[in-house]
């Protein structure tokens, strides 16, 4: 890294081949236009070729008519020669150690970026920047190598550095395309696996910390931080059937049950230093497991490259690189492909709200606040000590737009769950008065971030109609999951954080007190159809001292398991798509630890295994019963039978599908008391079969049931002309369906 000052002045024999000031600037790594000096240049009577090879004692030009020794133009390793005509050539360098190497001259190749690309990049409207910027393996004029292109408009010099040039920034300085602030170079002879960074000199002459590639497809395994050249290229995907049905599978009328996964801690290999599974190992083990449990999708905590494992991926540096902790980009593609083949969709958490201040990342990228706001009242997130993207800059939002499309196109992911949307929407998010700047209307809305989110959603759904976007938005911001043309933000779904907090609080209460908190289970129906909601029991609820979901259930061990089963029964029969964090499907008892495997040994306990059986059956019921998913996000899909029996802590409700005669009756008894002869009204006469009972012995319960089902009686009740008398088991949710 860096450069030598060398001795000033030209070698006598080269005085006519290069100006002294140019030679000195090249040798010091301070020339602003290296392509104007290096490589071939037509002059009167022929061509002057110049190359900087500080590792070389002698350099020869190899042309069709033989080889010609170059003159040393500067003692630090600048060589030059004048040849007749304009021959095609290569270089042969004799190193100081006596070894030799043949190489193509990077400075004889044409520009990397076409004029249209430069125009679109300057506008900030190039939606496929990932195909042009970063490191792209190419063949140019019959020569294999790598195109490098980088946005750094305020830099005075940018170079590609790596093992291939001794990390010497003088070796491969790049060409500046002034109209777009893009630096570019084609380096022949490089290929997949080359390790590199960018050496950037700020406009004031400061040498900045080496930077990883913002568009890098791959990176070294942390704690190393360099980028790695990786050619994604074309893949023979085997998920054509899935992709053809993607739109139907992600539709709001479809069953969507999501298993949330942290790749590094789902399962580990204790025999091999307790390492996490690789992408390829996960492809089979996770795929089979999730398919067996009946989840329709997995959601991965952020898989973007990130330096700090304890951030769980929520502080990414390499947005275009799946983390190398578990394998290569192609192996992550294999994971997605295999999951699709097993009928499982893939959602990734997408972090577009902030980025960390690691010196090799986007922070102060070209010596200026390029990606972030300069004013800390706009550009610094105090809670996380991270930096906030400048959504008002077209090149920055173009970077994020392209990244969203990149994961959908290059990795076939089915959806993006956008993290921390509330922090993006509000200028005063987690800030005291005086710590934020109002918008142009004097309000606290981040108008630029709102425009970004709307545009991002419109692009995703226009380019990939079968995909989905999901917002983690924790406030009452209206119309998050409504179309942009109607004034919404354009997301497909929104996490229902209010439902999660209310229901967790209720089921964490001792049953004797639940009558006083009855509204915690009913309140969500007042706003349940304002958005397309996902009901989340996510990783956020099993960290930071909160314990596990099971650990928050009250009572003795039997009651805790019963409460958890009843809660899951309630969740799966309420309107909204489902999300459950890994480990909670078998009643993990300890808080989640990102450095350890889930407690799989608990499955040796029949009670934990019973909870897993329940999740499997709930997913099956949810998928196969249209009444449980077709109208998840519409008022017509739900009706209370009785929501007022707070004294007994009993709730009864109907779920409905498109077919008005296809409905389910659900009854929840959330006290440890058996409720015999409990009468509820039903809309139609007939035999009501008990489809599911969370108190079944199959799930670890006491097996108090209704003998398979009950007949209606012509006793009007709850506003219906018929009713059924049930035996409600303690701390349980039961589901009934009329036989037709």
Curated annotation (Swiss-Prot):
Gene3D superfamilies: Glycosidases, Golgi alpha-mannosidase II, Immunoglobulins. InterPro entries: A-amylase/branching_C, Branching_enzy, GlgB, GlgB_N, GlgB_N_E_set_prok, Glyco_hydro_13_cat_dom, Glyco_hydro_13_N, Glyco_hydro_b. It catalyses: Transfers a segment of a (1->4)-alpha-D-glucan chain to a primary hydroxy group in a similar glucan chain. GO terms for molecular function: 1,4-alpha-glucan branching enzyme activity; cation binding; hydrolase activity, hydrolyzing O-glycosyl compounds. Its EC number is 2.4.1.18. One of its GO terms (cellular component) is cytosol. The keyword Nucleotidyltransferase does not apply. CDD domains: AmyAc_Glg_BE, E_set_GBE_prok_N. The active site is at 419 (nucleophile), 472 (proton donor). Disulfide bonds: none annotated. The keyword Iron does not apply. One of its GO terms (biological process) is glycogen biosynthetic process. Pathway: Glycan biosynthesis; glycogen biosynthesis. It comes from the Bacteria. PANTHER family: 1,4-ALPHA-GLUCAN-BRANCHING ENZYME. Belongs to the glycosyl hydrolase 13 family. GlgB subfamily. NCBIfam families: branching_enzym (TIGR01515), PRK05402.1 (NF003811), PRK12313.1 (NF008967). Monomer. Catalyzes the formation of the alpha-1,6-glucosidic linkages in glycogen by scission of a 1,4-alpha-linked oligosaccharide from growing alpha-1,4-glucan chains and the subsequent attachment of the oligosaccharide to the alpha-1,6 position. This is 1,4-alpha-glucan branching enzyme GlgB. It comes from Paramagnetospirillum magneticum (strain ATCC 700264 / AMB-1) (Magnetospirillum magneticum).
């Amino acid at each position: 890294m860096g450069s030598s000052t060398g001795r000033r002045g030209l070698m006598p024999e080269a005085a006519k081949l290069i100006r002294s000031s140019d030679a000195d600037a090249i040798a010091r790594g301070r020339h602003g236009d290296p392509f104007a000096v290096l490589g071939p240049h037509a002059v009167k009577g022929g061509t002057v070729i110049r190359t900087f090879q500080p590792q070389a004692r002698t350099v020869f030009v190899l042309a069709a008519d033989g080889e010609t020794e170059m003159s040393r133009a500067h003692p630090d390793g600048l060589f030059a020669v004048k040849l007749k005509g304009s021959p095609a050539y290569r270089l042969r360098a004799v190193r100081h150690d006596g070894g030799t190497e043949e190489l193509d001259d990077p400075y004889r190749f044409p520009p990397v970026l076409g004029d249209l690309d430069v125009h679109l990049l300057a506008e900030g409207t190039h939606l496929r920047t990932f195909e042009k910027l970063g490191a792209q393996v190419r063949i140019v004029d019959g020569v294999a190598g790598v195109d490098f292109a980088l946005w750094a408009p305020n830099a005075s010099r940018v170079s590609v550095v790596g093992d291939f040039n001794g990390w010497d920034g003088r070796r491969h300085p790049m060409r500046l395309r002034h109209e777009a602030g893009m630096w570019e170079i084609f380096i022949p002879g490089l290929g997949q696996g080359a390790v590199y960074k960018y050496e950037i000199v700020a406009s004031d002459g400061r040498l900045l910390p080496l930077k990883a590639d913002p568009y890098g497809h791959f990176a070294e395994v942390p704690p190393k931080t360099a980028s790695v050249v990786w050619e994604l290229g074309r893949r023979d995907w085997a998920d054509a059937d899935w992709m053809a049905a993607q739109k139907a599978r992600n539709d709001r009328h479809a069953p969507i049950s999501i298993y949330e996964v942290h790749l590094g801690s789902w399962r580990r290999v204790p025999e091999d230093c307790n390492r996490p599974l690789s992408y390829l190992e996960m492809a089979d083990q996770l795929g089979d497991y999730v398919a067996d449990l009946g989840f329709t999708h997995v959601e991965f905590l952020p898989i973007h490259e990130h330096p700090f494992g304890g951030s769980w991926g929520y502080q990414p540096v390499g947005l275009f690189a799946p983390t190398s902790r578990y394998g290569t980009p192609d192996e992550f593609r294999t994971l997605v492909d295999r999951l699709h083949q097993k009928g499982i969709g893939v959602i990734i958490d997408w972090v577009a709200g902030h980025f960390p201040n690691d010196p090799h990342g986007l922070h102060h990228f070209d010596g200026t606040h390029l990606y972030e706001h300069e004013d800390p009242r706009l550009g610094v997130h105090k809670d996380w000590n991270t930096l906030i993207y400048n959504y008002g800059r077209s090149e920055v939002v173009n970077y994020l737009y392209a990244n969203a499309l990149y994961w959908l196109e290059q990795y076939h992911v089915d959806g993006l769950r956008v993290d921390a949307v509330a922090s993006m929407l509000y200028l005063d998010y987690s800030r005291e008065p005086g710590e934020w700047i109002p918008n142009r209307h004097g309000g606290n809305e981040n108008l630029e971030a709102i425009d970004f989110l709307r545009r991002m959603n419109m692009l995703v759904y226009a380019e990939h109609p079968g995909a989905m976007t999901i917002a983690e938005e924790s406030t009452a911001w209206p119309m998050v999951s409504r179309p942009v043309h109607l004034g919404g933000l354009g997301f497909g779904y929104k996490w229902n954080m209010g439902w999660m907090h209310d229901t967790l609080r209720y089921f964490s209460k001792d049953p004797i007190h639940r009558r006083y908190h009855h509204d915690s289970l009913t309140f969500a129906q007042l706003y349940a159809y304002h958005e397309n909601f996902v009901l989340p029991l996510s990783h956020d609820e099993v960290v930071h001292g909160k314990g596990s979901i099971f650990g928050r259930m009250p009572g003795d061990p039997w009651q805790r398991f019963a409460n958890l089963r009843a809660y899951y029964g309630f969740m799966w029969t309420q309107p909204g798509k489902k999300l459950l964090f890994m480990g909670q499907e078998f009643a993990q008892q300890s808080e989640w630890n990102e450095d350890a495997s889930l407690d799989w040994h608990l499955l040796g306990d029949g009670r934990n295994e019973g909870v897993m059986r329940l999740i499997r059956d709930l997913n099956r019921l949810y998928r196969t019963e249209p009444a449980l998913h077709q109208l998840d996000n519409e008022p017509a899909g739900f009706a209370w039978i009785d929501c007022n029996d707070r004294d007994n802590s009993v709730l009864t409700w109907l779920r409905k599908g498109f077919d008005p005669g296809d409905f389910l009756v659900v009854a929840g008894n959330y006290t440890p008391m058996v409720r015999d002869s409990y009468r509820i009204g039903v809309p139609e006469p007939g035999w009501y079969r008990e489809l599911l009972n969370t108190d079944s012995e199959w799930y670890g319960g006491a097996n108090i049931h209704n003998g398979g089902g009950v007949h209606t009686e012509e006793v009007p009740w709850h506003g219906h002309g018929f009713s059924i008398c049930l035996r409600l088991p303690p701390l349980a949710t039961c589901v009934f369906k009329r036989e037709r």
